[in-house]
From Swiss-Prot:
Compositional bias annotation for Basic and acidic residues: 347-360, 453-462, 482-491
Protein name: Phosphatidylglycerol--prolipoprotein diacylglyceryl transferase
Family: Belongs to the Lgt family.
Phylogenetic classification of the source organism: Bacteria, Bacillati, Actinomycetota, Actinomycetes, Mycobacteriales
Keywords of this entry: Cell membrane, Membrane, Transferase, Transmembrane, Transmembrane helix
UniProt keyword Transmembrane helix, yes or no: yes
Species the sequence originates in: Nocardia farcinica (strain IFM 10152)
Bilayer topology term: Multi-pass membrane protein
């Protein structure tokens, strides 16, 4: 190995990438990843609320997306550099050592997107709109994460003599053995290389600025801003990969990440061109008005799924309760109450019908008929033409009973007047002759008795007739009301 200490480099590498606090190691790579995640959630939350979303949504989705993204990134790295772990001299267990570096961005975006999709399904929010809100924050998090590559002295490019070249130092452990990840540099420069981590970091920042400005000017939505993020990052990554010379899987002599970048770039451009233009309305970003549970509260998540259309209206419950036949018809509560009151009044009128009070019965029957007519008007064609005929017959019978009562009253009044005239005529005759008076009294008594019997008989007959008419009227009214009640339940 040839050490080069005479080359002036403007960018030195950190002497180490891990520090120990007692037995606990603090790795710069992990700290950069965590810092990037925190910044992405914080900024993404602000952007989501500015677009009309509810506070806390980005953190909720991140509880799914971040673990999925870390697993996907590591899986992509292991799959594309499998010889490092499963080849000759490799240790398969080290494939799980995520803290030692090695995250493939394409695997992180793909599997992290699946986690975000699951969360958006649970919380009932549109995934494309969510992607647009977090696209610039994600890319900024990637830029921060690239600093971890600097601390680990990894993902650098070919050797160069440019003044911004990066110094690479060999690192050794306490025993003096080479340890690039956990060791400490002795200050001797091994080589000067292209700082590809810095190239990608600066490119990411430029794309972030471009995305923010484009979003402000054109109000991009429906996932098209996220597509621009993917396309912009892929374009820059393609050229950065051309400058790297570290170990990687090759396809036809070309690094596999170059193929991936090209394919993803084309797919992102196609989505941007054919996706819906404009931006979603702010109300579409609302999850439905229920308290968001934490992801590990599975029972609460199931309960939250019921609230997609909001809580049930109180009126709907009341209308279902008023349905007496159990078929849960959507009868409005106010109409059901009015119909119930009318039916009760009609039945009360039938129960209180009395032949001795024909006038009140007739009036009550008219009221019941009017109520039945009003009920039919409220519910439309529920009674039918036969009900109209019954109500007309009831009204006619009530009118006949009233006429009969009036005729009976007139006859009784006439009989009373005749009796008064006869008594007035008999008084002078009594003054002239006692015998004549006695005879006249007997005659008047018989005549009065006859008239009394006749009047009583007339009143009995008329009362009987009126009672019969009232009963018929009440029955007709009851039938009409029963049909109205039946129509109410069928409405």
């Amino acid at each position: 190995m040839t050490l080069r200490s005479d080359v002036l480099a403007y960018i030195p590498s950190p002497p180490q990438g891990v520090w120990h606090i007692g037995p606990i190691p603090l790795r710069a790579y992990a700290l950069c990843i965590i810092l990037g995640i925190v910044v992405a959630i914080w900024w993404g939350e602000r952007r989501w609320q500015q677009r009309g979303g509810r506070e806390g949504t980005v953190l909720d989705v991140a509880m799914f997306a971040v673990p999925f993204g870390l697993i996907g990134g590591r899986a992509y790295h292991v799959a594309t550099d499998w010889r490092k772990y499963f080849g000759e001299g490799g240790n398969p267990v080290e494939a799980l050592y995520i803290w030692q570096g090695g995250l493939g961005i394409w695997g992180a975006v793909f599997l992290g997107g699946i986690g975000a999709w699951i969360a958006c399904r649970i919380y009932r929010i549109p995934l494309p709109a969510f992607g647009d809100a977090i696209a610039p924050p994600i890319l900024l998090a990637q830029a921060i994460g690239r600093l971890g590559n600097w601390f680990n002295q990894e993902l650098y490019g070919r050797e160069t003599t440019l003044p911004w070249g990066l110094e690479i130092y060999p690192r050794f452990d306490a025993a003096g053995d080479p340890d690039p990840m956990n060791g400490i540099s002795n200050g001797v420069v091994e080589k000067i290389v292209h700082p590809t981590f810095l190239y990608e970091l600066l490119w990411n920042v430029l794309v972030v600025i471009a995305l923010v400005q484009l979003d402000k000017r054109f109000r991009i939505g429906h996932g098209r801003l996220f597509a621009l993020y993917v396309a912009g990052y892929s374009f820059g990554r393609f050229f950065v990969e051309l400058m790297r010379d570290d170990e990687a899987t090759l396809v036809a002599g070309i690094r596999i990440n170059n193929f991936t970048s090209a394919l993803v770039f084309l797919a992102a451009i196609a989505y941007f061109v054919f996706a819906t233009k404009g931006r979603e309305a702010p109300e579409r970003l609302q999850p439905g008005g229920t308290t968001r549970p934490w992801p590990w509260q599975l029972a609460a998540l199931r309960a939250a799924g019921v609230a997609a259309n909001g809580p049930a209206e109180p009126g709907a419950t009341a209308s279902t309760a008023t349905d007496t036949d159990g078929d849960a018809k959507d009868t409005p509560p106010s109409d059901a109450a009015a119909t119930g009151g009318q039916g009760t009044a009609a039945k009360g009128d039938r129960g209180t019908a009395d032949a001795a009070d024909t006038a009140k019965d007739a009036s009550a029957t008219d009221s019941a008929s009017n109520s039945a007519s009003a009920t039919d008007s409220d519910f439309g064609e529920t009674a039918g033409s036969s009900d109209d005929a019954d109500r007309a017959a009831a009204v006619k019978a009530a009118s006949g009973a009233t006429a009969a009562e009036k005729s009976a009253a007139d006859k009784e009044s006439a009989a009373g007047e005749a009796a008064a005239d006869t008594s007035a005529a008999d008084q002078p005759a009594a003054d002239k002759s006692g015998s004549a008076k006695s005879a006249a009294d007997k005659s008047a008594g018989k005549s009065g008795a006859g008239r009394g019997n006749e009047s009583e008989s007339t009143r009995d007959n008329e009362s009987t007739s009126a009672g019969t008419a009232a009963s018929a009227t009440g029955s007709a009214g009851a039938g009409a009301t029963d049909r109205v009640d039946s129509g109410e339940n069928d409405a």
